[in-house]
């Protein structure tokens, strides 16, 4: 197919692309020669305007009011994508009206119907064009001005164009070397062959007109062959009548007649269309060919109505008037028509194919009817698709709203995520700080545990030492208890003996007092008697002296009287015995006084040291009780904490010193006991002396022989006892002081242990609180991580939803774009509608 033929197919398609015939033709040819059509369109924009003018004028020539005014109504009406109910079936009525009009016509009528069926869907397609295409169409006034300018320009170009260029263009136009075998070029070739078969004997003017038409078709971009064929058919009817009128004319008249017809037809066409339109060209060509056609061939065209003959006669008269003006043009075109004779001979070979082409035309008519049915189905499908597109637009609007809402939600979620991230960073910082604190606390706890383990070891050691000390103290306490019991028993025995002795001494004192009083009275009486006796003794001495003198005298006389009398010797012995009796009570009284004084001093010495001993034994018992209480406290405080090593060393030293002092005290007590035993012997001797005092009263001579050393020892014994008792009390005081020190140390240790226990409890509580805080922060961080994961999942879900909604918005557009090629390739299939319905259901479900 040549470039002009591709433009003939594709040119109307730019304006009327919804007809099924044009759709099939366009998609079959545009895929092959898309680049060529673009180049031709760029170079020949002016020819498009002339082709549009031709379309507007040819509609008025047909005489169809509805079809002729249809493009104007489409241009005036706004573009609407929806198809109304009354307008859906408008092409049906038009086409059936055309079929009714063409039922009685011959083979050229079929070509005319075919050309009409090609043109009218192109006109119908303007309903479905976009508003931009409708807005780009020029106004009728502008079109007329452009038509006039284009006619003048085309005339000048055709007059001054060289013959060589016209020949090449005509040959290229009619040979059709590059024509592909598609449906639309096949129909066009059939129509051209029919027209050529009716125009076999061509005249000189016909050749020139054909050449001129070839030049115009080759120069223009959109050669509307369908309109040309229809114009040829219209031009054939008046030419028959003109041929019948001028059969008797001369050759000069025949040569001039076609020229006049051509000029008259040209003038007639100037009133309606441009002079260089394809309809005018083919009219002139048809009129010139009919003058040279034989009578056998004109019988097929003699059936035209008489009304058209009258119109043609009027047109012929007008053409005769204008024929003189066109003689000069005919002379110029004479050379060009010579080149067309060779082409006419080639075209005569195609006449044999007419009967084949008639069958093809019938088949094409059937195919056209099927295509019309398919077109109606496509229109219905398109209406459904438009409805579904509206639904999809509504769904897309809803999806846009949902997208906006989701974007708002996403923005809010992003803000929340940012806040959560800030909180998460803060929590991480807190967590890091708390982990550091936890590590510090853990290190502190480890150090504390180490110190506690060391202290536990030290406590165990101290407990061991404590056990040893307790054993030692228990043994010492047992010994002390035993000694205490022994001492208490001894003390009780001493107290009993002392009480007995005191009682005895009191009795004795009373007796002695009574005796002393008696003795004092006796002494006083004796002193009185002594004085009296001294006086008597003096007297007696005097008497004794006298008596001695007398005795001497008597001895002298006795000697003299020995023999005489024995009585005077017995009287001398009696006064001697009286004197001895008087001397003895004086001596006994002196000895008794000295002995009483000694025993009184001893008793006083005994009473005086024993009273403070009683007073001192009471604090000893109290201190022993305090020691027992402290030992009980030590036993109760075994589980308490242990002091430091220095305190333990000091306590060990103090315990050692105390043990040594206790041992020294025990030794001293033993020494004192021994000394007491010795003094007991002396006391026993003193008791024996006291017991013997009674016996000594009767034996004064024996008392005079009493040892002076023993008396000195007896007088020194209470002093020694007091000294030893003082030493014993001092030792007891030292023991009490050491016991108080031990109690103070134990109390200090108890306080220290209690403090350590409290500190350990505090540390344990602090560690427990830290562990609880760490666990709580870990839980908080876990919750924050979970919230972040949830927010990330929500964001991902929203992103997926947005993508899905964007895909849903894109899908109707893509399917609307791909809908036309699918409908063109498969016009009868309804699978796309079902697919769209299913997709619409999916969209509604997803929304």
Curated annotation (Swiss-Prot):
Name the InterPro entries for this protein: CAGE1_homolog, CAGE1_N
Q: Give the signal peptide range.
A: none
Kindly state which keywords UniProt assigns to this record, in alphabetical order.
Coiled coil
User: Which residue stretches belong to region Disordered?
Assistant: 118-161
Q: Spell out where the chain crosses the membrane.
A: none
Point out the coiled-coil segments of this chain.
Answer: 377-567
> Per the record, a Pfam family?
CAGE1
Q: What is this protein called?
A: Cancer-associated gene 1 protein homolog
